[in-house]
Amino acid sequence: MEEAPLRDLRDLAWFERNLDAGISALHLDDERLIAGDWDGGLHCWDLDGEIQWNIKASNRVSGFAVGGGWLYAVCGRDVVSIELSSGQICWEHELEGSSDLVACTPEGDTILATSSVFDLEMNDFIESTIWRFNSEGELLHQDSIDERPWAISMRKDGVAFLPLSRPRCGMIRATPDELHHTPLPTSSPATCGTIAQSHTVVGHVDGTLTCIDDGMVMDDDTYTNQPGTIESIAATEPGFLVSTVIEQGAVGAGFGGAEGLARSYDEKGKLLWQIETELGRNIEHVMYGPVVNEQASAWFTSWDKRKSIVEVREAIQGMPLFRSESDSRVTSIEGNREYLALGLEDGTLYLIESDLLSRRLSSIEEQKDESHRSDLAEKLRRLRS
């Protein structure tokens, strides 16, 4: 497959903003874009780029959940409730250790947050706590476990599901009153998870993909196991994207091996296409993005500790659309069929919009065609002379 043409994201972006600290979390919906940064700043814009509000939390923002009229954020050691329209902080609660994940019901009346304690001598997480609050900030329940959850999804009734790392691995089912541990088909630790169109997909260290629907583990052949540790998953479109970290010479790595491998599958689990990166370059994020050429785009970001590459292809056909390079690492990405937001370690934020992206890419292609025709005409003139 041909290499994607190199483009500057600034030339393709709907708008660009520059924060004073690296971007650590993003939320994107039909009305707004919210960015959290490493210094605890939270910034909200409408989709035309007009600032709506700015507030300051205690420390690095690691995640968001939106329900009803509230934004819930995990920041440093705290979980914070923010009025979505004004940015006013309604309440905040200090957790034990560092805050990690947050989820809420669609109405925002039940909130679940997780925090973990990291042991420097053991170089591992030794304890996590799962916290349940109501919309007023009242702590309803808390439980501690020996594992760290790596993803969280919550049903409308407030029951949540959290895939775990070692020692038990498996999954926690968190009800309003207690926690229930459930083994998964693999005993491998979870690494990531994503909420798909109607279910949750969990990635594991051994390359397994587990599909969970309403708390039930589905025997679904759609989610093909991968040849290495799952790094990132996207499943908001029919089908899914997945990136893995694989060792040199592993099956599926191609000749000589590849540090990063990303694949696109259709809704039946058929492999559509894949991309590989050279040794030392890891594909850290995959995401479906704005429609181009009447199909969703597929976005991949990779990093080799020196240069970040964003590569964009047609989700179904795999045709390269463009790639962009930067000295700053992509740290967060959120997308849908209309917009895609990219946050970088140096504080740069881009919002990409479907129609503008399509027009800019078409304009570039037309310029290339015109240049090609001019070159041909010049050659013909030389032949005639």
Predicted features and spans:
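Short, solvent-exposed loop/turn segments at conserved positions within beta-propeller repeat blades
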Residues: 74, 120-127, 164-167, 249-259, ...
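Residue-level signature of beta-propeller blades and closely related beta-rich strand-turn architectures
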Residues: 39, 77, 116-118, 165-166, ...
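A short helix->beta-strand "capping" segment at the edge of beta-propeller domains
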Residues: 1-21, 48-50
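Beta-strand-rich domains and repeat architectures in extracellular enzymes and scaffolds
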Residues: 13-43, 56-62
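Short loop/turn segments that connect beta-strands within beta-propeller blades
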Residues: 46-49, 83-87, 133-138, 174-177, ...
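Repeated scaffold domains used in trafficking and secretory/extracellular systems
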Residues: 21-27, 59-68, 96-107, 145-156, ...
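WD40 beta-propeller blade core
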Residues: 43, 80-81, 131, 169-172, ...
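Blade-level signature of beta-propeller repeat domains, shared across WD40, Kelch, NHL, RCC1
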Residues: 326-385
